[in-house]
Amino acid sequence: MCHNKSSAPPTPAHISIQQNRTPGTDPVPYLHASSDTGSGDTIVLLTDIFGVTPFYRHLAAMLAEKGHDVVIPDVFHRVGHATDPGRDAALARRRQLDDRLAIEDIERTVAHTVDDQQTFGVLGFCLGGSFALLTAAAHPNQVTATYYAFPKGAPGAKVPVKPPLEAADAIDGPVLCHWGRDDYIDHEEIDQLEQILASAPGPSEIRWYDNAGHSFLAGLTEPNHPSTAAAHDSWQRTVEFFERYLTVGSAN
């Protein structure tokens, strides 16, 4: 499971979250979160198969409070909303997704919201984590953080794309990846990805968390969650990662 039911506190009054679209005849809907105190660099947040849930709006607001502009493209906009908030409906919608078009939508969102050559961040979860690693291979100015990404690609696509394992050796920018030891994703695949990233041009770090499974970041907003410690530690590292690489203005 990912973050379809994770709790989310109310958005602070000084944080604006608005619905926008990219220009053109086939616009991509996206949410834009920013602070009324002003924002600087851009972080593109890529969700899991449940799409833009309240939990991701909350993460966007938290990053906006740190001074980032945050955009969340809706890569499922061609498929439509899930019939209900459950896992089966999300998986059914996943099976209708053309991953090639999803990547194109992410690229168009980046082109519309990020200045040419500007260093920008991408934060991806599950399916979105796999997409984040793929776009990182195409953008040397991308700073990438992921949670529970699938090294061989998230299963079930109507039209798949090549997996991160086949693209990671071309990643120039810094990468930070988080997984829980109890995640159902094959650990050998993650080890393969770590080896490839270690030989890639950009710096990389793989973080493992004990007693944490898939979607362990839910502990960030749920005090009694079994992975609360892992969630808070990983989030602090993610925030510091973006502050370090986005603040200096260079992904290298």
Swiss-Prot record:
Catalytic residues (UniProt): 126, 183, 214
Molecular-function GO term, any one: carboxymethylenebutenolidase activity
Cross-referenced SUPFAM superfamilies: alpha/beta-Hydrolases
Region (Disordered): 1-28
UniProt-listed GO biological process terms: catabolic process
Reaction(s) catalysed by this chain's protein: 2-(5-oxo-2,5-dihydrofuran-2-ylidene)acetate + H2O = 4-oxohex-2-enedioate + H(+)
Enzyme Commission number: 3.1.1.45
Physiological role: Ring cleavage of cyclic ester dienelactone to produce maleylacetate.
Family under the similarity heading: Belongs to the dienelactone hydrolase family.
Protein name in the entry: Carboxymethylenebutenolidase
Species, as recorded: Rhodococcus opacus (Nocardia opaca)
Taxonomic lineage of the native organism: Bacteria, Bacillati, Actinomycetota, Actinomycetes, Mycobacteriales
